[in-house]
């Protein structure tokens, strides 16, 4: 009996050690499974990030993807031009050359016939080029913060000859610039730094609807919240009395201080910094923030002020907001995501008691 008891006593510590090792292994494995929730107001750059993750961490776009995005490029381009033409009468702007009226009618007819996803005919391409070169159209484009216009409009309209070529095939950059409204939940899986990522883009989601599903994501590792810096002087599509950045601030407040995300890391992506840097020279930040009193609209100071406004929404003394400024440039976002991943690894291991 004494020998048996002694053997049991000796076995107990080793069993406990095995349990500890098993718990540690499970913790390490759990720390390797990363769920990221992508949130932000409409047109804040969420879909672009999903596409960039596909380029960086998967095999990029397939031949079928390139084929499917071709009509999207055509539609985005002509719809952007139409948005400018429609805004001209509202803003009291006329064509510099009256001959452009017939060109405008041709473009409107294409939309009326729902042929905006078709390749441009030679006549249509020539009309679009003449319209884009018209001084009146350019004046209206310069006031695009006063109406709704895709921020990729200039990118595509400046390159009409390439888009209008008979053998045109979209580039990766073209696909990144396209705008397709996200419906439902988009899920992307990829591996990076020995981690297994699941990235969820839940689209726009009305505030009233958000309450119904937000708790389903309480176990996410981190939230990436996207803000379009360049939209500080624009209003919402659905409510043209509400400033887009002010709406983003409200949404960020509701997410950052949500009871479901008390222990969730929050990464703030201030997107479209390239467009913001260009716009801040001519459109004052006071449109969104009247209290911003700098006489000279300098990019660095203005960007820092926007960042401070979002960070000030954090009511927690223990939660840290990890902020990064990003552009449409994939190389820039690869560097940013690399830094973000290091933060996620450290926080996840710490949460499992392994760091």
UniProtKB/Swiss-Prot annotation:
- State the source organism's domain of life: Eukaryota
Q: Where is this region: G3 motif?
A: 197-206
Positions of region (G1 motif): 35-48
Annotated region described as Disordered, given as residue ranges: 1-24
Coiled-coil regions in this chain? Answer: none
Task: Please give the residue ranges the record annotates as the region G2 motif.
Answer: 174-182
Q: Where is the composition biased (Low complexity)?
A: 1-17
**GO BP, one annotated term:** adenylate cyclase-modulating G protein-coupled receptor signaling pathway
Disulphide connectivity of cysteines: none
Q: Which InterPro entries match?
A: Gprotein_alpha_I, Gprotein_alpha_su, GproteinA_insert, P-loop_NTPase
Q: Name one GO cellular component term.
A: cytoplasm
Q: Where is this region: G4 motif?
A: 267-274
Lipid addition sites, N-myristoyl glycine: 2
Q: Name one GO molecular function term.
A: G-protein beta/gamma-subunit complex binding
Where are lipid groups covalently attached, annotated S-palmitoyl cysteine?
Answer: 3
User: Where along the chain is Mg(2+) bound?
Assistant: 47, 182
Question: Which stretches of sequence are listed as region G5 motif?
Answer: 326-330
Q: Where does GTP bind?
A: 40-47, 176-182, 201-206, 271-274, 327
Tell me the keywords, alphabetical order: GTP-binding, Lipoprotein, Magnesium, Metal-binding, Myristate, Nucleotide-binding, Palmitate, Transducer
Q: Where is the G-alpha domain?
A: 32-355
Q: Which residues form the signal peptide?
A: none
CDD domains cross-referenced by the UniProt entry: G-alpha
Q: What does this protein do?
A: Guanine nucleotide-binding proteins (G proteins) are involved as modulators or transducers in various transmembrane signaling systems. The G(o) protein function is not clear.
Q: What family does the database annotate?
A: Belongs to the G-alpha family. G(i/o/t/z) subfamily.
Subunit-structure text = G proteins are composed of 3 units; alpha, beta and gamma. The alpha chain contains the guanine nucleotide binding site.
Q: What is this protein called?
A: Guanine nucleotide-binding protein G(o) subunit alpha
- The species this protein belongs to is Manduca sexta (Tobacco hawkmoth)
């Amino acid at each position: 009996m004494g020998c048996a008891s002694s053997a049991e006593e000796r076995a107990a510590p080793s069993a406990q050690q095995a349990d500890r090792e098993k718990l540690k292994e499970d913790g390490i494995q759990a720390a390797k499974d990363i769920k990221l929730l992508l949130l932000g107001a409409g047109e804040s750059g969420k879909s672009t990030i999903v596409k960039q993750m596909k380029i960086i961490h998967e095999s990029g776009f397939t031949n079928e993807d390139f084929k499917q995005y071709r009509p999207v490029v055509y539609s985005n381009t002509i719809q952007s031009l139409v948005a400018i033409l429609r805004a001209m009468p509202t803003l009291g702007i006329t064509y510099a050359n009256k001959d452009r009226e017939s060109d405008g009618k041709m473009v409107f007819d294409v939309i009326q016939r729902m042929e905006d996803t078709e390749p441009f005919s030679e006549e249509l391409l020539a009309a679009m080029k003449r319209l884009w070169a018209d001084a009146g159209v350019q004046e209206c484009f310069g006031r695009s913060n006063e109406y709704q216009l895709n921020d990729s409009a200039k990118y595509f309209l400046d390159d009409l000859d390439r888009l209008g070529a008979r053998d045109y095939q979209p580039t990766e950059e073209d696909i990144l610039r396209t705008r397709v409204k996200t419906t439902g939940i988009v899920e992307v899986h990829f591996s990076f730094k020995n981690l297994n990522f699941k990235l969820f883009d839940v689209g726009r989601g009305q505030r009233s609807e958000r309450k119904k599903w937000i708790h389903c994501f309480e176990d996410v590792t981190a939230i990436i919240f996207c803000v379009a810096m360049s939209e500080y002087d624009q209003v919402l599509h659905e409510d043209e009395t509400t400033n887009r950045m002010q709406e983003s601030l409200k949404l960020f407040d509701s997410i950052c201080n949500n009871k479901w995300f008390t222990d969730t890391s929050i990464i703030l992506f201030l997107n479209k910094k390239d467009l913001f840097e260009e716009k801040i020279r001519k459109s004052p930040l006071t449109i969104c923030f009247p209290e911003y009193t700098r006489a000279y609209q300098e990019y660095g100071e203005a960007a820092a002020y926007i960042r401070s406004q979002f960070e000030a929404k954090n009511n927690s003394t223990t939660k840290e907001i990890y902020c990064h400024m990003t552009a449409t440039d994939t190389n820039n976002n690869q560097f940013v995501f690399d830094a973000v991943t290091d933060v996620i690894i450290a926080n996840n291991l710490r949460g499992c008691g392994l760091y």
